[in-house]
Structure formats: C-alpha cells, structure tokens
C-alpha cells in the first residue's frame, strides 16, 4: 500500500497566537448557515482527581496521599465531541437516555452549558448514567500515571448504557425517526449498538455525512465494527485501539483516519493509500486525555468552515488542512487538565 508523508510541522510554543486566534474566532465559521450535528454513544460523568503527597514522595515506599477533585463534568468520546462542537457554534444535538439521578441531571446540565441543544436528551428512572473516575497520581517510581475506574450512579440498572429499541411493535427507534423534522449535516456515533448503527444507516440514506469512531475494538465482535464502518462515510480510530489494518481494503469508498499519538495522524481517502501528517509538538504537556476527541470535533468543525460536509467534497488538500488544524487544537488542549481544558481556559 502506498504511503506518503507530508511535512507541515508546527510547534505549539511557537504558534500560540495562531491557535488563540482560532479559538477567539471559533463562532465565525458559518455566518450564512449554521451547521448541525447529531451524535450518540456511551457517555460518562468524569470526575478528575489529583493525588497530592503532603509528606513528599519516596519511590518504592508506601506514600501517604490525599485526593483532590479537580473537575467533575460530562466526558467520554461522544460527550466531549458534542460539547466541543456546541462550543464551536454548531447546532449540536446529542442523543442520550440518562437516568434522573443527580449525576444524570448534571450531565444534561453540562451539555446545555457547553451550548448543546438537549431536545433529544432525557432523564428518567429507566435511563442509565455512567461514572468514570480518572485519578492523576504517581507510580511506584514517581512517574505520573492515570488510573481509571468506572462506576454507575445509584439507581442505574443493567445495562448501563441505554439506547432506543429497534424491534417489536413498541420499538422506539422508528418513533424517533418518524418524529424528526430536520436532517443534521453530520451524524456521529461511536458504539456498535444496533439502534445507533441503524440510525446512522438511515441518516446516510438521506444524504447525511456519517462519522463513525472506534474507541476500542474487541476482535470477537469485529463483524459488528466492520458493519458500522461499512455503513459510514468517515471512520476514525487510534493506533492503540486498532492495530491490524487489513480490513481497510474493504473500505475503499470511505475516509479512514488513524491517529498515531506523538507520531501524528494518517488518512486513507477512497483506498488511494495512506497519507501521513506530522504531529503538532507541544513542549508543555499536562494531560493528554481528550486529545482524540478534540481531533474529531475540530476536524468536523474545520470541514464545516470549508463547506465540506458532504463526502463528495473531500479532497486530499481539504483533509490535510483540516487534520492539521484539528491537531493544533488537540495539542493545545494537552497543556490543560481535563478533556475540555481549552474551553475552561478561554471562558
């Protein structure tokens, strides 16, 4: 497979004025027609905790620590993407079936705070709410690490993630579709849940650009992932989530994007071979959580600014420009604690 590299490197420390001007003018992207996105997936209420060691830290010893809650807000891939695009000025319509716990209500409130339209978000006793605790600590050798623990709000029953039903006379997905009075410019989702895949397939049949993100691929469920990818226009995943790329040969009518961490990003448009773009270097990394979500949201936003919200609009030049802009945002966000640090620092 042909692989090309394009060298357009930036260093965040040298381009702060550029990225800050992008941030300050974020809502000037679309004066004539406000773009819209509908998105769904597995949402979390993230609690970001930092461990402090009041008596100092000695490698190899059991050190006393205290935990300080730094941030508590909606997170996860779909939560971040939809909130970031709401902040960018899009009409952002998340779909979510939360419970009516305090945590579930906060997630809805957070969506509104970031500019989302919560018309398709519900808080009911039958809903589900996921909680994720992210602890910033030091390992036994004194190196910074992140520890993750997922839990669920009181009253959230199994299964934790709630979705529309697709079968039976009382199926809720057909009712949702029947009640829609508009088509978004983009439909985004990140799970293999049948309802969200079927909604994406239907959206695509109506001319909506469908963006599918693979967070983690379990090979025993590979056929489900492949089905989602085949029914989408844009497919994105990281090199950590997906290592074997042999299936990409079956996606020759797609845009496939793979993020490479510190090595940058690469894309394959319509089976023409991989094009590798360099990273945007940041010499002041605080927290890399959420960088992939910033890449996704900023890439979608960059496409919108260029009027490229139809798959036919995608060219190598447009994708290159948009992915480099997306990496600018993702790299900048790494200088802040939390998945939406840029927003917090600029509001």
Language-model region placement:
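Positively charged N-terminal leader segments that act as targeting/secretion signals
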Residues: 1-4, 8-11
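Short hydrophobic alpha-helical segments enriched in small aliphatic residues
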Residues: 11, 16-17
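Glycine-rich phosphate/adenosyl-contacting loop at the front of the ribokinase-like
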Residues: 18, 23-95, 102-106, 113-116
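Ribokinase/PfkB-type carbohydrate-kinase core domain
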Residues: 26, 30-48, 110-123, 136-278, ...
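Short pre-catalytic strand/loop immediately N-terminal to key active-site residues, enriched for Gly-Thr
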Residues: 65-73, 279-290
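Short, small-residue alpha-helix embedded
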Residues: 82-84, 286-314
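Short alpha-helical functional segments enriched in proximate histidine and acidic residues
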Residues: 114, 302, 329, 333
């Amino acid at each position: 497979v042909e692989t090309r590299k394009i060298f357009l490197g930036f260093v965040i420390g040298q381009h702060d004025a550029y990225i800050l001007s992008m941030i300050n003018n974020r809502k000037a992207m679309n004066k004539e027609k406000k773009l819209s996105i509908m998105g769904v997936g597995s949402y979390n209420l993230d609690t970001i905790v930092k461990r402090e060691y009041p008596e100092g830290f000695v490698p190899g010893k059991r050190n006393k620590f205290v935990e300080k809650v730094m941030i508590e807000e909606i997170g996860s891939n779909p939560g971040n993407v939809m909130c970031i695009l709401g902040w960018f000025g899009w009409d952002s319509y998340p779909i979510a079936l939360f419970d009516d716990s305090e945590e579930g209500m906060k997630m809805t409130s957070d969506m509104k705070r970031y500019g989302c339209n919560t018309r398709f978000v519900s808080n009911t006793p039958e809903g589900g709410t996921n909680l994720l605790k992210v602890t910033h600590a030091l390992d036994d050798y004194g190196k910074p690490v992140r520890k993750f623990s997922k839990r669920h709000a009181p009253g959230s029953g199994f299964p934790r993630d709630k979705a529309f039903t697709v079968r039976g006379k009382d199926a809720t997905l057909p009712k949702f579709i029947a009640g829609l009075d508009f088509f978004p410019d983009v439909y985004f989702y990140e799970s293999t849940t049948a309802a969200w895949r079927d909604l994406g397939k239907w959206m695509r049949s109506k001319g909506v650009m469908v963006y599918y993100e693979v967070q983690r691929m379990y090979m025993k469920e590979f056929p489900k992932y492949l089905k989602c990818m085949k029914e989408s226009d844009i497919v994105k995943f990281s090199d950590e989530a997906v290592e074997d790329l042999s299936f990409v040969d079956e996606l020759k009518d797609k845009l496939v994007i793979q993020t490479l961490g510190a090595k940058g990003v690469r894309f394959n448009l319509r089976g023409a071979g991989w094009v590798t773009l360099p990273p945007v270097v940041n010499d002041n990394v605080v927290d890399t959580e959420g960088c992939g979500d910033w890449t996704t949201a900023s890439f979608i936003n960059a496409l919108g600014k260029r009027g490229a919200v139809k798959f036919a609009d995608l060219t190598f030049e447009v994708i290159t420009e948009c992915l480099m802009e997306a990496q600018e945002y993702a790299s900048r966000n790494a200088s802040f604690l939390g998945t939406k640090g840029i927003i917090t620092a600029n509001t």
